[in-house]
Amino acid sequence: YFLFTHEYYEPATSERMADFTADKVFQKRVLTIILAKSTVILTGLSLDHALKACCVISCIALLYGFRGLLRETNPNPAAGSEFLIIVPLAWNYIALNGIYHSYDLPSLAFFCWGIVLFLRRRYAWFYLLYAIASLNRESTCFITIALFALLLRAPTKSIHVFPLREVVKYNRLLILHCTGQTVLWFIMKNSVEYVFRGNPGNYYEKTFSMYKFLGDAWAGKASWPYLTPETFLGNPRCFITLFAGIWIFVPLFWQFVPEQTKKLLWVAPPYLFGAILFANLMETRVYHEMNIIITACAVGGIHEWWRARHKKTC
C-alpha cells in the first residue's frame, strides 16, 4: 500500500493537513492527522511513519471488524473469510488508482465496528466511536443507514398493507437511535466545517464528468485518472474490474446470500446518490463502504452455495 500509492494533489498533502492549511474538503477529515501529530510529539517518529502506523492499526482493526460484521449478519460465516476483504481493497486502492489519503482505510474499520457494536448493544462504545469516526470522514452517516436497514421490522399482517403507524410502533427505539445518530452526525460535521471555515477551497470537490469518462472508456481514450490507455491499468476500460470483479458473485449467488446480509445493500442507493453529487465516480477509492458491503454479500453467497452443494453430495 505504501509502495504503490501516492499523494497526487498538493493542497491535500500530509504536510498541508498537519499544518491545518489543506483545502476544506480534505482538512475536515482531521482525525488521522491529529493522531499522527500526537504520535510525533510523544514518540519522536516522523509524520510519515506515524501515518503509516495509523494505517497498519486501521488494517488490523478492519480485519477484526469485518469478521465481526460477517458473524453478525451471516449465520454460518466461513473461517478466515474476513481476509477476502483484502482483494477488492488492494485492487481499488492500489492497482486501479493508487491515490493515498490517510483517512481512507480507517473509515472502513469504523464502518464495520460501528455496525458490530450497535448490533451487540454496546451503545456507549458505539456512540463514542460514532463521534470519533465523524472526525475521520463524514461517511459515518452510512453506519446509521446500514443499521436502519438491518434492524427495521415491518408489520407482517398483510403483504398489501404497510401502515406507517405500525411501522413507527414496531421500530420506536430504532427510530430514536437513528434520529440521535443523525443529530450527532450533523453536530460533528458542522463543528469541523466551522473550525476550518477559513481554509482555502470548498467543502466539496468540483467533480469530473462521469459521462465523459464513460465515453472515453468506450473509445479507449485517456481519461483521468487513467492516462496511459496503451496499458491495461492505465486504460479507462479497466474500470469495469471495480472491486476486483467480485461484485459479479452477488447476482450469481443471490439466492444463497443470507437475508440479513442482503439488507446491507440498501446502503447502495443513498451512497451512490451522494457519490454522484460530491465524488469523482471514476476514482475507485471513493467506493469505500461499498467494498465492505459487496464483499460481505459475495462471501456469504459463495459460502452458502458451497454448503448447499456439499449437502447434496453427502
Language-model features, listed with the residues they occupy:
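Short hydrophobic/aromatic helix or loop-helix immediately within or flanking a transmembrane segment
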Residues: 21-45
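Membrane-lumen/periplasm interface segments of specific transmembrane helices
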Residues: 23, 145, 153-157, 162-256
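Aromatic- and kink-enriched transmembrane "portal" helix at the membrane-lumen/periplasm boundary
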Residues: 30, 48, 55, 62, ...
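Transmembrane-helix motifs of polytopic, lipid-linked glycan transferases
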Residues: 53-74
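Membrane-interface alpha helices of multi-pass inner-membrane proteins
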Residues: 112-117, 124-150
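Transmembrane alpha-helix segments characteristic
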Residues: 257-276
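Hydrophobic/aromatic-rich transmembrane helices and adjacent perimembrane loops
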Residues: 282-303
